[in-house]
From Swiss-Prot:
It comes from Arabidopsis thaliana. Belongs to the drug/metabolite transporter (DMT) superfamily. Plant drug/metabolite exporter (P-DME) (TC 2.A.7.4) family. This is WAT1-related protein At5g40240. Keywords: Membrane, Repeat, Transmembrane, Transmembrane helix. The keyword 4Fe-4S does not apply. It is found in: Membrane.
Length: 368
């Protein structure tokens, strides 16, 4: 009986902690890959309005059969239901964040986007407190850690945006990757509007935090991940049609060729608008908005490597210092969150000595 109980607890730990951790890490890899491909495609002339529109089209078409096959276990609400209005808001917020993010990367680089993404835990925690999804006890060490971490994250982001500094790693020209780009300056973010890009990216990650909060509320009412994500992408597509067609009036820009632009659009539609949205929606339902946002700092190292390999981006001192401050803030927030979750779990396990023993033995895992 004891062994069976331990196996049950271990399986529960695996499904509720290990699997979400691995899934969120995969999402960060997919997101950085999409940012890098998008930046490379813009250097070849891809309009970010075209990119956003076609990406939503791809994900919506792929989700349609999935929602029919797997998403009908719960009856759909009426068309006039407040739920559909909330999902429409999800589509609007998601579309706005995509536009801000694409424009921000076009002005700067995927590395800056990954650095600024560390604001997401601070934004999400603040919004979660405002909407009473997180408890604030000022005398609690967990709450103090989350507040200090949020302040450090914002400070680090300001350093990244406002202080570029000298090069730590020199940029390199990779003409084999982008053969039509001949000027070295086109391959780096040196000539880009760093501050404007940073502000746009900060706006993107604030909107993403709003999306997390709103999506969590939607999942509380209608916990059908595939159906919700399908309608989210459908509404985002409908919103993007007039906006993108009006903003990008050059018809030749809408003609796609089998090159890196098409690859970037398909990749984004499959791995960001579909896979990442589904995974985040599932994670929000399982773990909550603050947990999902805590994985953003993992993208920094991935973005630096991809930017250096595929874009020839230089690494600047300001990005290094700011990212270090951001990471300290991130791990401070995650420590506070882990401590808070541990206290809640132990408090709820007073009647289950076996579960309590398992928690104590596995105390080395900060995300449990």
């Amino acid at each position: 009986m004891r062994e069976a109980g331990e196996e049950k607890v271990a399986w529960k730990y695996f499904t509720r902690d290990v699997v979400p951790f691995a899934a969120m890490f995969a999402v960060e890899c997919a997101t950085v890959g999409s940012n890098t491909l998008f930046k490379a495609a813009t250097l070849r002339g891809l309009s970010f309005y075209v990119f956003v529109f076609y990406s939503y089209i791809v994900s919506t078409l792929l989700l349609l059969p999935l929602s029919v096959i797997f998403g009908r276990s719960r009856r759909l609400p009426a068309a006039k239901s407040p739920l559909f209005f909330k999902i429409f808001l999800l589509g609007l917020v998601g579309f706005m964040s995509q536009i801000a993010g694409c424009k921000g990367i076009a002005y700067s680089s995927p590395t800056l986007a990954s650095a600024i993404s560390n604001l997401t835990p601070a934004f999400t925690f603040t919004l979660a407190v405002i909407f009473r999804m997180e408890q604030v006890r000022l005398r609690s060490s967990a709450t103090q850690a989350k507040i200090i971490g949020a302040i450090l994250s914002i400070s680090g982001a300001l350093v990244v945006v406002l202080y570029k500094g000298p090069q730590v790693l020199a940029s390199a020209s990779f003409t084999t990757v982008l053969p039509t780009v001949t000027l070295h300056q086109q391959l780096t973010s040196i000539e880009s509007s760093w501050i404007i890009g940073g502000l746009l990216l900060a706006s993107q990650y604030f909107l993403i935090s709003v999306w997390y909060i709103l999506q969590t509320r939607v999942m509380e009412v209608y916990p059908e991940e595939i159906t919700v994500v399908f309608f989210y992408n459908l509404f985002a597509t409908l919103i993007s049609v007039p906006v993108c067609l009006f903003a990008e009036s050059n018809l030749t820009s809408w003609v796609l060729k089998p090159d890196i632009s098409l690859a970037a659009i398909i990749y984004s539609g499959v791995f960001v608008s579909l896979f990442s949205a589904l995974t985040h929606t599932w994670g929000l339902h399982l773990k909550g908005p603050v947990y999902i946002s805590l994985f953003r700092p993992l993208s920094i190292a991935i973005a630096v490597a991809m930017g250096a390999i595929f874009l020839g981006d230089a690494l600047h001192l300001g990005s290094v210092i700011g990212s270090m401050i951001l990471c300290i803030g991130f791990y401070t927030v995650i420590w506070g969150k882990a401590r808070e979750d541990t206290i809640k779990t132990v408090a709820g396990s007073e009647q289950s000595p076996l579960l309590l023993t398992h928690i104590i033995e596995d105390g080395a895992f900060p995300l449990s």
